[in-house]
Each structure stands twice: as C-alpha cells, then as structure tokens.
Amino acid sequence: MAFVAASILPFSSCSDFLDREPITKPEAGNFLTGAIQVENYINGLYMTLPSFSKFGLGVRSEEKNSDNIIAEKYDARLHGQNNQFSGASDWQTGYQNLRKVNYFFHNYKVPEAQENEDVLSLKGEAYFLRAYWHFDLLKKFGSIPVMDAFWDENATIAGLQIPAKTRNEVARFILSDLVEAKNLLHSRGKYSGIRINKEAAMVLAMNVALYEGTWEKYHSSDDFASSTNESNYFLGEVINWGNELFGCGIDLYKTGQNPGDAFAALFNSKDLSGMGEVLLWRKYSSDEGVFHDVNGNLKAGVVDSEGAAGITQSLVDNYLNADGTFIDPTNEKFKDFKETFEGRDPRLIQTVMNEGAKFASATTATPMHLEEYTDEKKNTISPPKLAGDGNTRSLTGYHIRLGIDTTFVSGNGETALPIIRYAEGLLAYAEAAAELEMWSDDIANKTLKALRERAGVKYLAPAKDANFTDFGYTLTPVLQEIRRERRSELALQGFRLDDLMRWKADKLIGGKRGKGAYVGDESILFKSYSPDNQKRIRERLTLDDNKWADPMAGTLPSGYQFHADRDYLLPIPPSELELNKKLKQNPKW
C-alpha cells in the first residue's frame, strides 16, 4: 500500500489557534470508533513522513545543507544568512503534524472489546508519529513546548501560555512515546516494512537518544547546553534499545556477486519488502498514481534541482580503500578522476558517478567514460557535465549515482524510498558504545565490521588517520572510524546536517566551502572535453591554486559565515513569542 491519502484537517501554527473553527467537540460521527475509521485516519498521517516529490530530487539533494554537496543556491543557514523568520515554516509544519496526531488521540473511541492487535498497532503508529515530529522540532529548535494533547481546547490567550520543556525533557517524552509505540506495534514482517513497525520504533528511539546524548556532551559548555547534562543517560538508552533490537533477528541485506551490489539495491529497487534491513519504506507505483521524478533528474545529471551543484571532494575523500586502509588525499593519483575510484570502498562507486556507470538504462545512456577527446571518439566519450547548463551542470565533476534505476528509460519514477534502516541502529549503537568507553571486539563485530564487510570493505582495527577531518577536538581512533562510517553509509540520505549539529562541528563549516575534482590542463577529466567545452569550463569554473575545482570561490570568498554562537538552532518565530510569553528565544536570535 502506498500511503498518499489526502490531509483530513486544515492545520496551522499555534498562533492561529484563536482564529480556527473549534473542533474539540466533534459530531458523534467524527469519533474514531472502528478499525476502518482508525486505519483511514492513520493512513492520512503517512503523508507527513519523508517522500520523493513529483518534482526534484527530495532527500538526494538535501545535503547541500552540509559539506557533502556544494550548490550555486547554497544553504542560507550555513552562510549565516538566516533571519528571525527562518524557523517559521519548520515550526508551523511540526506543530501542524502534531495537531493531526493529537486529533487522533483526542477522538479515539474504539471500544475495548474491539481493540484487537491490528487496531492497537495503528494506535502505536500514532505514538510513533508523535515522537517523530517532536524529534524533528527538538533537532531544529531545542527546548520546545511538548504537544502531548489536543491544544484546540486551550484556544484562548491564557490557555496557550505553555512553557517550553528543556531539551532533555523533550527527549525523554519522545522516548516514552516510543516505548508506547513499541509495545503496541506489529513487527516488520506483518506488512514487510510498508507500515510503521516495532523495529522501526526501536531504531528511531536509538537515533533520538544518540542525538540528545551527543548534543549534551559536545555542547556542554556553550549557550546551547541542556540545563541538566544527561549525556550518559541518553547514550545508555541507545545501548538499551539496541540490545533489544539485536534480539529481533534482523540481518543486513546481502546479495549480488560484486561488492556494493547489496548496498546499491537498497536505493535503486522498486520493491524493498524482501530486504529485512529496510525497516520502513515508501512504495511508488504509477499504476496507483504514486510516482516521482527522481529518476528523470538523476538521468540528466542533476544534483540540485534549484541550480548547478556537485558532490564535494570532501565526501569522496571520506571513503576508505577496499582493503580497509586510509587514503592519502594528497597522493598525486587522485588527480586522475578514474583512479580516484579504483580500489576504493564500493559504496563510493555506488554513491558517486564514475567510469563505466550509467545515468539511466543501458539502451538509452552512454556509460561515463573519460578519454582524451578526438572527433573520432566523441560518441563514446562521456565525461561529467562540467560544461552543462542550468541544474544539469556539475560544479565539482561528481554526480549522484545513489538511487539511479538503470532500468529507467523515461516517464515516471518508481524506485522505493527507505525511511528507516537497520544500519542506522548499528551505527548508533557503535557510537554510543564508543562515547561511553564500552567499545569491544564483540561490539565491533556486530556493528562497524558487519557494515564494512557487507559493503565489500575489509575491517581493520581502528587506528589514527592523520588526514581525517579535524573537528577542532580530539577523537579516539574508534570514534574517528565511526564518524567516517556514518558519512559513508548514510551519504545523501539526509543525516549529515544533524550529525554536524550534534557534534558541534562548526569548524567544518565556518570559513570553508566545498571543492571538487582536479581539473588541471593535463588531467584526463579536462582532456575528455571538446575544445569548445574546454573553453566553456575555463570561463565558468574557478580553480584553486592547485587546479582543484573551487566553484564557489567568487560567491563565498571567505567560505561559509556560519555563526557558531547562533546557527546551531533555528529562531522561534516572532509570532509565537508574541502569543506565548512563556517561550524564550534561542541564543543570539
């Protein structure tokens, strides 16, 4: 089933409650009294979960809000250009969705005798969704009012004076909702991951606890610190939830003769029901009128639908060699675009377009191929789109391969969207264990080693990498490798900004800008273009002093101007502060 039911109620932000027609006393027919009514309502709430839109790339291009993608239409938050209204849409959307969920609880009147396992599992889905949207607001705003009831009954100025909970109180509330969800939900096997389930709730709980635990650790001495540091408590909760998850008998998906095939299949398949690792996913089917345009955009080489963009050299350099050893990004071999991918972690090859890879069906697309240009060979040479136009132009030489359906020719896209994966739980467990100094061979074997071996990377005991990203503070070799693994396993899936924020990683943002591949005159990349296109590239693409692509040098001459004392959180909308005098604005806003 693809959940695309229309929204049932009109929703708006807290400040609009006074203007809305009250719905706290519905007619008898509006109560949710039977299984069909409950299921229909919950199905409508699935619209609030991540999805691919009919236009654009969705989550695939979202990480231009991080150091994984550089875009002409750069992220305002990274560049310190947010203003006091920049959080309004996120605040409104979050509380709109919470109001939807709480309307369900307010009007849930199923007689106890009819509350079978299916009905109770639907109720569990509501608890999951309430937790999901509180978590979204927590990440963006920190301390927030917890919407644990249907607030329309408070639709007076006095009634809406609701103080924010501290961020650790919000996180505890989220985890309590997920306990309720877990106890009510069916297991993943009941609906093959197409509905919210017990295991998905466990992984969400681990992500919540990891986020809060590491936020409280790394922000313990700044203005974003929690009033009470409960870092170890939340990291311990990751371990507790993880131990329960391990008892569910889930395995990482493995298939294919070539390393990386299993990883690629998680993102380029239409049906994920048989991949138990994908705990929750969204299905697309043209026959059911549910489709997207991700395939069409990827086929054209688009990285950001708003304009020219490209995957950064920083992300490419994050991946290990397939033998488990570090790369040395200063090695001359990496000036050769083709050699950059040789002998590397197969996830790099499945995430970034490279020699021999196709943007679409083999019958309609030429594989990427770099070779010195001649008129005789022009029909077989197919380099990155550095000379392209509009949003098909690459700024870095690195296009997205992740999620490309190589059976796609044209028309509607039907590749499925993973929403929650078991791999997220393994990464959370590994990180929490390392932060709590609980790391052991047993934990390594079932987390970091399992992920790398599934990907086709030899697992080596963590050691210090002198070229690893400098976060501005010391990391143990284990934490270094866990952070590397998160970036490799979760690239272009919407996690990177959250990781940078909770790790207090402004050193990776402020004064920095993404760069791209080596494009010196002697490079195979540059030689693959016709003379006319070489001229276009030289006119439009800025290079740094060492001839690496530096496309935003003119636009961001001093790099991103991220405000480390302000931009870790979004501003609470002024209209909410005006209405609710018990709210306090976030630091420096």
Locate the predicted segments by residue.
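C-terminal motif of bacterial Sec signal peptides marking the signal peptidase cleavage site
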Residues: 11-13
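An aromatic- and glycine-enriched ligand-binding surface/loop that stacks and positions planar moieties
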Residues: 15-74, 105, 144, 148, ...
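Conserved, well-structured interaction surfaces
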Residues: 34-50, 71-141, 157-193, 337, ...
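Long, intrinsically disordered, low-complexity segments
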Residues: 94-97, 173-175, 259-321, 412, ...
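Structural register within alpha-helical repeat arrays
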Residues: 123, 130, 205, 212, ...
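C-terminal substrate/ligand-recognition segments
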Residues: 341-453
